[in-house]
Regions:
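Intrinsically disordered, low-complexity domain-flanking/linker segments in eukaryotic proteins
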Residues: 149-166, 266-283, 468-497
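Conserved, mostly hydrophobic/aromatic
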Residues: 213, 233, 250, 308, ...
Length: 545
């Protein structure tokens, strides 16, 4: 089970904590945050509200009066991790603190709000996305429910084992505070305690999704797309910059859809490139779009990067390409999940794009943004994916030569259109196809890394590398975070006998991309100029320029 509430110091938070009672509160909470960066922001909001209301946060499970598990339910493996974490928390409670309340939040509760109370009676409270700012009240509810179980309190006597929870003590059903279709979206005044290191942050510009992708359950869990007002986003960005944040990562379910719902008569369900271009062309000059937002962010004072994550290929415009190219503070980096390239697969996935459109879009992006690094992801083993469809994808990967790429095996998700499709692929074949695709990408990435040797990069210094970090770097793989134990070390020059710094360039998003290892000691959380001197399959080696 992940560690409970691995919190940074208070200097990392956007929230000004002045309530001394937060330290001496009789109620303490531990929080386990699972899933993506968007879910992490929800966890930050929950912790911010808890601290604001005088509830203390603990890193130690046995010290927590209430444990919150913020779950992910995007794919089967994430759902399994969420369920396992909930059940482990409930089981550990029997031996560490029978009076400990248990709250389950996030996407799992949104997806299975009707089923979970019967499936998990050991949970005290289920809360949804709309309730993240009500977390303090729900913590009180969970705590009260646990303290009202006298038979549990007595179970520590000689007649009862502390590891045995009396079924008579359980309430009839957990409290369920989950709305069917979330509408919540944070604003600049939302209490928030950042869980990222002090030098970078995630800034959520929108919530929800309007796309009809057949494999995805997100619209059902997160609701329809809803954008924040541009001035509200700018105000939050200013606050982050004032705190010393050097990299602002813009996140949402579809960042390229940003602003289209803010117009007077918003279009609903826009998906195809043609419909999107038509809607964009009719926007007034002062309308909020991702392009206008980036231009406004670029005008803010300070030395920082802006990185755009989670774009959709159907919603790119020539204006957006030109904006990224011209804004010096916007990282020359494109995160654009394509999922597949074969026409049959794109149609079955309901991606609303074609191979011809995708190829022309990538050509426009590379031509319009010199030095751009393109990250994409693909799904292999989707129902009906023949060997021919898959080979078409392999050829496309080989020809396009993405700087950054991830491959996921298709996850069967009930409640999705794809969940009822015939011609399912065996799990072993899915894994084999993923490995074949990543083998091609490994060679592409290594060739790209070799081309960077001798170049001067501006990098963000993150931390000093310890011995384990250096050892992992020698055999690190992007294949979903696994280490390549089958390979000989690729970077013998990475020695713990001398200092190395861990850094990232514009081509490296936090947690998902490569690293740059800089020889020597440099101040952390600063931008530095370095010269690339070597590489591994996925990482670069450098020295101060």
């Amino acid at each position: 089970m992940p560690d409970i509430a691995l919190l940074p110091s208070l200097r990392h938070t956007c929230l000004q904590v002045t309530n001394q009672h937060a330290i001496d509160s009789p109620i303490s909470v531990g929080l386990i945050s699972l899933g993506c960066a968007k879910n992490l922001v929800d966890s930050e909001i929950m912790i911010g509200n808890l601290i604001k209301d005088g509830i203390s946060i603990t890193n130690t499970p046995e010290e927590a009066d209430v444990v919150i598990v913020n779950t992910c339910s995007f794919i089967d493996s994430a759902q399994e991790e969420s369920v396992d974490t909930i059940l482990e928390s409930a089981e550990m409670r029997k031996v560490r603190n029978l009076g400990q309340g248990l709250i389950v939040a996030g996407c799992l509760t949104q997806r299975y709000r009707k089923e979970l109370p019967k499936l998990m009676p050991e949970v005290d409270v289920f809360m949804g996305i709309d309730q993240v700012e009500e977390v303090s009240q729900l913590v009180q509810v969970a705590r009260k429910r646990r303290l009202q179980r006298p038979s549990e309190a007595e179970s520590t006597s000689e007649e009862a084992s502390p590891s045995e929870e009396s079924p008579d003590s359980a309430p009839e059903a957990p409290v369920m505070e989950v709305t069917a279709r979330p509408v919540y979206i944070p604003d600049v005044n939302t209490a928030r305690f950042r869980l990222t290191p002090s030098h970078f942050a995630y800034l959520k510009i929108a919530e929800g999704c309007n796309h009809p992708c057949s494999f995805c359950i997100i619209p059902r869990m997160r609701g329809s797309h809803r954008s924040r007002q541009a001035e509200d986003i700018l105000a939050e960005a200013r606050a982050l910059i004032a705190e010393g944040v050097k990299e602002i990562n813009l996140i949402s379910q579809d960042s390229t859809y940003y602003g289209l719902d803010l117009r007077e008569n918003p279009h609903r369900g826009i998906a195809s490139p043609e419909k999107f271009q038509e809607a964009s062309a009719s926007l007034p000059e002062n309308a909020s779009t991702l392009s206008s937002l980036l231009r406004d962010l670029n005008q803010l004072e300070g030395d920082f990067w802006i990185r755009v994550l989670y774009t959709h290929p159907a919603h790119w415009t020539d204006e957006l390409i030109a904006t990224i190219a011209s804004c010096d503070k916007v990282a020359k980096y494109v995160d654009i999940p394509l999922q597949h390239i074969h026409p049959t697969m794109l149609e079955r996935m309901r991606r609303e794009t074609s191979r011809d459109y995708i190829e022309k879009l990538l050509e426009r992006i590379r031509k319009g943004i010199p030095g751009i690094a393109i990250r994409t992801t693909f799904i292999v083993g989707f129902p009906g994916e023949t060997e021919g469809c898959f080979r078409s994808l392999l050829d496309f990967i080989q020809d396009t030569r993405f700087e950054r790429m991830g491959v996921f095996t298709y996850s069967h998700e009930e409640g999705t259109r794809a969940g009822g499709m015939a011609n399912a692929i065996e799990d072993s074949e899915k894994a084999h196809r993923r490995d074949r695709a990543m083998a091609i990408q490994r060679d592409i990435s290594r060739a790209w890394a070799s081309e960077q040797v001798g170049k001067i990069f501006k990098v963000l210094i993150e931390a000093q590398a310890d011995e384990k970090t250096l050892e992992d770097a020698k055999v690190r793989s992007w294949e979903h975070g696994h280490l390549r134990s089958d390979l000989e070390p690729q970077a013998p020059a990475l020695s713990a006998d001398e200092p190395w710094m861990v850094a990232r360039g514009q081509a490296d998003a936090p947690d998902i991309d490569g690293r740059i290892y800089v020889r020597g000691s440099l101040p952390t959380h600063t931008f530095q100029q370095v010269r690339i001197t070597g590489h591994t399959d996925y990482d670069l080696l450098a020295e101060p320029a």
